[in-house]
Amino acid sequence: MRVALCALALTSCPAAAAPFNSCGSGVCFSGNINHNAILQRAPERSAVYGSVNTASPAGAQVVVTLAGTAADGSAYSKDFPAAVNADSTYKALLDAMPAWGNFTITATCSACAGSPLSVSVVGVTFGDVYLSSGQSNMELALYNTFERNISLANVRSGKYANIRVLHGGYQGLPPNQDGNWILQPGPNVTNCSQTGLADGMWCSGLELAQHDDNSDGRSAFFNVRAVPWYFAEKLTDLFLSDGGVPPPPIGLVFNPVGGTMVEQWTPFEDQLSCASIACMCTSSGCNGSQPLNPNNQSACSRNGELWRGQQQPFVNMTLKGFLWYQQVQLDRRSPHPGA
């Protein structure tokens, strides 16, 4: 089952205000920057960001080093200093890099508190990165589609080796938390064939195809989200059909949550200007008839919860575009189903 989608091209987002610190060690990367990550290629400058121990002194500086082999085989190494902000976060913009290459990224903060004072991720390359969000239609796994076995056979034969996926997990945040502008660091594991599709790990299709899910014995590749994977397959095929142009690496970041409403994904403040948006139900009761206003954010805590928990960590990530798929939950309340 194929689904046709279009992706909206983006440039890198500006640094966000008041990020949330989630690194208790000396220095760390945000969890979306892990081993085997795909970062956005030129002409954009890809962002590398994270946080340091909150006890670090004022004026501390993180040096982000990108070193490795470029696509043309030449050696590359360059430092990118990044000031530590008052909230203990940092962000560096790398040079615009062409597709492919094999790099190590290191963040070092010799003046920071705690340990380690230097962390590295390996196997990083550059390509086109897409954020895939939405409701259960986007959450649907390959296992539930008709062409899953065709995709599995293609991956095992070495096709679509340019595609890597990152599973972002789930985190909804109440309004009394500003939200995560970075993610918890991912597992220090470099090959998904031993783990399957785990939160915070960049995985190739072949690695997942080599791992059986212990819960039911099927290939872990079938746990990949179907819509973005088929999108990346089709995009790869289009590159190859265009005079045999080698496809770039394609990075797919998954963070959909089934059974959700668009109000959960939208910043609370942005919903205040729309009179038709009401307060969503909470665990303590339903305030559905209550209009939103700046003073009832606690009572209407579900409005915006997924923006704070699911989307904010990727605001600073440089992207090629995004995929959004949501319908069923909205249909249940719409006078025009499917609209």
Q: Which residues make up each language-model segment?
A:
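Cell-envelope and extracellular/periplasmic
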Residues: A18-A339
